[in-house]
């Protein structure tokens, strides 16, 4: 059975990276973060550092929003991370609690 951790990408990014390293050392296989262009730091930049600092952990967003992220950029980003670090990324896709949902009252 695999286990994962979920962290917010709160500053400093170095703290998130260190916590993911400790999680891998403790036996966790997955490192997830939230993706918000408003609330936290940019997760995809941090994923590159997490992947560099770990040896086997799979990382990615719990949910990335197709309304706020361009799909061609996301596809290129994941292809590049997988090329650099092996097939160690995963992506949840959905609208989550996005500003569009909040503003539209849905």
Model-derived segments and spans:
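N-terminal beta1-alpha1-beta2 module of alpha/beta enzyme domains
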Residues: 1-62
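Flexible, glycine-rich active-site loops centered on histidine and acidic residues
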Residues: 2-9, 70-104
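Positions that flank functional sites
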Residues: 38, 65-66, 97
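Solvent-exposed, flexible loop/coil residues
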Residues: 43, 67, 106
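A short, GP-enriched loop/loop-strand-helix hinge that lies immediately N-terminal to
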Residues: 58-64, 90, 94
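Structural motif corresponding to the early beta-alpha repeats
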Residues: 61-73
């Amino acid at each position: 059975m695999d286990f994962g951790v979920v962290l917010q990408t709160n500053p400093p990014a170095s703290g998130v990276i260190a916590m993911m390293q400790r999680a891998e050392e403790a036996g966790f296989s997955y490192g997830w973060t939230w993706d918000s262009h408003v609330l936290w730091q940019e997760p995809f930049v941090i994923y590159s550092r997490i992947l560099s600092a770990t040896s086997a952990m799979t990382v990615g967003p719990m949910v990335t929003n197709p309304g706020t992220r361009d799909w061609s950029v996301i596809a290129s980003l994941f292809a590049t991370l997988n090329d650099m670090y092996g097939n160690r990324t995963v992506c949840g896709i959905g609208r989550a609690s996005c500003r569009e949902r909040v503003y539209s009252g849905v």
